[in-house]
Amino acid sequence: YEIPDEELEDIFTRFKKLADEKKTITSSDLEALTLHRSKISRPEESTAPTCKLISHSITSGSDIPKISYVKLSRDNNIMEGVEYGAGPLDAAFKAVNKMLGVEARLEDFSVRAVTEGEDSIGEAVVKISSAASGEMYTGSGISTDIVEASLQAYISGINKMFEAGE
């Protein structure tokens, strides 16, 4: 199995971030990073702009408003958005939709641990639908931070919408 240089560089960047977050990196962690990256790689011929999560922050609690700050890049343009929602993910997804000017609706959502331990890597999978066409798109993301994994998954689904010409 060969990994293209650009993909290997992305895997290494994600590995360094993971090493900063965890005390011990396991072979399962490395497998999750590698397999997930190859699963979400974009076709070389695609010309659709790719959105990428740069950073995020949430405020959430039982007696306070749920607020999400999201910073994205698209076509080398940096965008920032802040939104309120019923929960931190609702707020985050609203911020992404507003920044990108899309009407995507969350249809299905799941999170699972793909490695062991309290600091395990979580994988989020979302199914979103386009309000314009009704088409469904699936996205996935991984991180030790499940909010980050969820945002990666949502953005992955939106990137697929863009690739389909929406």
Residue ranges of predicted features:
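Terminal or standalone catalytic/regulatory effector modules within metabolic enzymes
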Residues: 1-166
